[in-house]
From Swiss-Prot:
UniProt KW keywords: Aminopeptidase, Cytoplasm, Hydrolase, Manganese, Metal-binding, Protease
Binding site for Mn(2+) 1: D282, D359, E361
Name the UniProt record assigns to this protein: Probable cytosol aminopeptidase
Subcellular location: Cytoplasm
Gene symbol of the encoding locus: pepA
UniProt keyword Protein biosynthesis present: no
Species per Swiss-Prot/TrEMBL record: Mycobacterium sp. (strain KMS)
Active site: K289, R363
Cofactor notes: Binds 2 manganese ions per subunit.
Length: 513
């Protein structure tokens, strides 16, 4: 269903029954639950007859299966026309199943079938969209840089048949929406997983442009000369140390219906600004990082990746709001031309900043982008970045921190939890602004304290948000990149977080304002 120039999702179809022909090489994924300390088939009717259910449950009993969440068993079932059945445990039986539980176990199932080309599933009877999303996200692979020696010989999951009793029109729309969302997440993952040798500011900008134009977006790119001329001191300053100059990319989805009078938006239409940090590699600059795990800094453009994927998704889903993404891109390198600790730069808009630590570079490029984004007079501003290591210390590897205007911050965090990305609202105490005082400039880019690092960074960014704009920043320093083992629908490497959160916010704004 994807027409993107990048990631191609499996083909998804929805059926009201198991086809009797053409599925001889397919695997049927069947959810089971824990019932009376044994595994019992769930969501069988009307897709599985009693003989098939009895055969599956008898086989599971002989294996001692309990139906615990994530527990899988591969079975050959003579009563069904498929090659085999994969049972996937949901855990203790309940009346309703949260969407992310369905999404997560679908991801587990897909990962356990990594050499299977075609699957069918009755998980979709529990939640059609969540099952499709989970299967696509769980089957994600990044193999672009594998040679013939190590590349997978199979093509991975290419076809999904979701079994559902939904009406044809509802099923078609749900399948397309789920495919589009999962494709957006996979696109963000691809960006994050692409090494900095191949994804530097100019190349990143070109790929963003290709995606944007394919989705019908308006695209603008400012090169290094244009950035200097326009006064983007933060982006220029961070990029000074690299031989690969910085860029600023603007992607615009004009979904709000215009009136005839001067192109004004009607009262019910909203404009949302998105800003994402695009540091294609971060050494820390002159304030250089430790060598251990520096290779993970290929993910320091995770915020930009998610923002680009989200605005493309908004266009594909034809959201009736304006969404304008402003994406600064730079490489933070040490060299004879790099900015130094103690330098003073002028952010776009005129604020002067004493750079006490060149490894606090993300906030410098974001501040420029925030000011530019606010010139579009948005109703809402959502930023995201791999902002601070302090996010990881405070919230761990899977929980983004959300800072911003109190009501909008809470709205973003709530929606993030609903879609399974599980962000947590964080405060911005007013007294932290005193920690950013400078004796030579308007602001310092870091405080002199090692405490509250995430909140101090958020306080810095707040200084650049225009009055009256509802604002939220999502810090995904650890959640954007999974350095551990895969789990659920989340692979090792780029995760695509917080693409689904931002899209959920955009959808709610489109519905409710």
């Amino acid at each position: 269903m994807s027409s993107d120039p990048g990631y191609q999702a499996p083909v998804v179809t929805v059926s009201s029954s198991i086809p009797r022909r053409g599925v001889g090489d397919s695997v049927l994924i069947v959810p089971v639950v824990t019932r009376d300390d044994a595994a019992a088939v769930l969501a069988a009717a009307p897709f599985l007859d009693k003989d098939a259910v009895r055969e599956i449950e008898a086989a599971l009993k002989s294996l001692g299966a309990t139906g615990g969440e994530g527990q899988t068993h591969r079975l050959v079932v003579s009563a069904l026309p498929v090659a085999s059945v994969l049972t996937i445990g949901l855990g203790k039986e309940r009346d309703e199943w949260p969407a992310d539980t369905v999404r997560r176990v679908a991801g587990n199932a897909a990962r356990s079938l990594d050499k299977v080309a075609a699957v069918l599933t009755t998980l979709s009877a529990l939640d059609l969209e969540a099952a499709i999303e989970g299967l696509i996200l769980g089957s994600y692979r990044f193999t672009e840089f594998r040679s013939a020696k190590t590349a997978p010989k199979d093509g991975g999951l290419r076809a999904i048949t979701a079994l559902s009793q939904e009406s044809k029109s509802r099923a078609r729309d749900a399948a397309q929406r789920a495919t589009d969302i999962a494709t957006a997440v996979a696109t963000a993952r691809d960006f994050v997983n692409t090494p900095p040798s191949h994804l530097y500011p100019d190349e990143f900008a070109k790929r963003a442009k290709a995606l944007g134009e394919a989705a019908g977006l308006e695209v603008e790119i400012l090169d290094d000369k244009a950035l200097v001329k326009a006064g983007y001191g933060g982006i220029v300053g961070v990029g000074k140390g690299s031989s690969r100059p910085p860029r600023l990319v603007r992607l615009s989805h004009k979904g709000a219906v215009r009136t005839r009078t001067r192109g004004a938006r009607p009262g019910g239409s909203k404009r949302v600004a998105l800003v994402g940090k695009g540091i294609t590699f971060d050494t820390g600059g002159i304030s250089i990082k430790p060598a251990a795990n520096m290779h993970h800094m290929t993910s320091d453009m995770g915020g930009a990746a998610a923002v680009i994927a989200t605005v493309v998704l908004a266009a594909k889903q034809k959201l009736p709001i304006d969404v304008i993404a402003t994406v600064p891109m730079a490489e933070n390198m040490p060299s004879a031309t790099a900015q130094r600790p103690g330098d003073v730069l002028t952010q776009y808009g005129g604020t002067t900043v004493e750079v006490l630590n060149t490894d606090a570079e993300g906030r410098l490029i974001l501040a420029d982008a925030i000011v530019r984004a606010c010139e579009d007079n948005p109703d809402y501003l959502i930023e995201t970045s791999t902002l601070t290591g302090a996010q990881t210390v405070a919230l761990g590897s899977r929980t983004p921190g959300v800072m911003g205007s109190d009501a909008f911050r809470d709205r973003v965090a709530t929606l993030s939890q609903q879609v399974g990305e599980n962000a947590w609202a964080m405060p911005l105490p007013e007294e932290l602004k005193d920690d950013l005082k400078s004796t030579v400039a308007d602001l310092a880019n870091v405080s002199g304290s090692r405490f509250a690092g995430m909140l101090v960074a958020g306080t810095y960014l707040r200084e650049f948000v225009a009055d009256g704009v509802e604002w939220a920043h999502i810090d995904v320093a650890a959640p954007a990149y999974n350095s551990g083992g895969p789990w659920g629908y989340t692979p090792k490497g780029g995760t695509g977080v917080p693409t689904r959160t931002m899209f959920a916010v955009l959808e709610e704004i489109a519905r409710e304002g």
